[in-house]
Amino acid sequence: MKDIIFDTFQNDVSTSLIRHKSILDVLTKYTESCSKVNRSVAKAVTNCGCIDITASKQEFNNTDTSLDELSKAFSTHLNGKLCDNCREVIENEIGTSLFYLVSLCNILYINLYDVLINETSKLDTLGKFTFR
C-alpha cells in the first residue's frame, strides 16, 4: 500500500510539472526549496521564538561507551516545540522540497520508493553502524 502512495505521488508530480522541465531548473528549484526549509526553521527560532537552539560541543567521556549510550549522549540542541503556525510553514516548505526531489527522480528515471527501500535495507543490515 505504501508503495502505491509513493508511486501515485511520483506520477502526480510528473504530470503537474510544466514550467521547470529542465534538469537545471529542477536542480536549482530543489536547492532553493531546501534553503526555504532551513530558513523557515530559523524563522521559528528568531521571529516566533517557539523553539530555540542552545548549541554546544557534543562531548562524551568514556571511550568504552556503547552505541546505544553514545546515541543518548548527543543532543539535538533544540528546545521547545513548534507552534501550529511554524509547523504549518515548515511542513509546506518540506512538501515543496519533496515535490522537487521527486521531479529530479522523474527526470533521472529513479523511483523514489526504490530509493527508500534501498536505504531501509542498508539501515536494517548495518543498523547503528551506518553512522549518519
Protein language model annotation of sequence segments:
Residues 1-94, 98-132:
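Flexible "arm" and connector segments at domain edges
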